[in-house]
């Protein structure tokens, strides 16, 4: 088996595996197990001290104006 044949075989294998995984995470309109796989995310709240562009999504549920290291006033999660 030469290099080109090996590369083609790996591409075919990757495509087959990708199709199998895509089937496993197909959208489930009833909100079942497949939907949980598709919408699996990391925590969405913003930790304390980080900039908060909106008054929501802070882990503390509070966002206030604070002075940063350059002297500008920015909104940060409490």
Swiss-Prot record:
GO terms for cellular component: extracellular region. The keyword Secreted applies. Keywords: Calcium channel impairing toxin, Cleavage on pair of basic residues, Disulfide bond, Ion channel impairing toxin, Knottin, Neurotoxin, Secreted, Signal, Toxin, Voltage-gated calcium channel impairing toxin, Voltage-gated sodium channel impairing toxin. The record marks 51, 68, 76 as: Critical for insecticidal activity. Residues 23-41 form a propeptide. InterPro entries: Omega-atracotox (IPR009415), Omega-atracotox_CS (IPR018071). Expressed by the venom gland. Belongs to the neurotoxin 08 (Shiva) family. 01 (omega toxin) subfamily. Insecticidal toxin that reversibly and voltage-independently blocks both mid-low- (M-LVA) and high-voltage-activated (HVA) calcium channels (Cav) in cockroach DUM neurons. Also causes a modest block of insect sodium channel currents (Nav). Induces potent excitatory symptoms, followed by flaccid paralysis leading to death in house crickets. This toxin comes from a male specimen. It is observed that propeptide sequences coming from male specimen are identical but have only limited homology with the female paralogs, but the reason is unknown. This is Omega-hexatoxin-Ar1f. It comes from Atrax robustus (Sydney funnel-web spider).
């Amino acid at each position: 088996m030469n290099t080109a044949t090996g590369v083609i075989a790996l591409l075919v294998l990757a495509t087959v595996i990708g199709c199998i995984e895509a089937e496993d995470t197909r959208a489930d309109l009833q909100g079942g197990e497949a939907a949980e796989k598709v919408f699996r995310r990391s925590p969405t709240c913003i930790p304390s001290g980080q900039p908060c562009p909106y008054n929501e999504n802070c882990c503390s549920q509070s966002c206030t104006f604070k002075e940063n290291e350059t002297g500008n006033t920015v909104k940060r999660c409490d």
